[in-house]
Curated annotation (Swiss-Prot):
It catalyses: RNA(n) + a ribonucleoside 5'-triphosphate = RNA(n+1) + diphosphate. Signal peptide: none annotated. It holds the Pfam family RpoY. InterPro entries: RpoY. The gene is rpoY. This is DNA-directed RNA polymerase subunit epsilon. Gene3D superfamilies: RNAP, epsilon subunit-like. The lineage of its organism: Bacteria, Bacillati, Bacillota, Bacilli, Bacillales.
Amino acid sequence: MIFKVFYQEKMTEVPVRENTKVLYLEADSERDVRAKLKKFAYNIEFVQSVTGAHLEYEKQNADLKLTEIV
């Protein structure tokens, strides 16, 4: 499943909408997404699963590039 993750790069700063970044990640669950991103110390605001029509929309209208985490 593909997830869209909204996050701030620094955990110590107050989230500001204009600084929110997005990445796409393939994972089994939201818990798996958070576990994979834990080592980066991002301030994760929201994790959204992207499927069906939403996935097709993201492919057409956004820079949908899956982030690979080793």
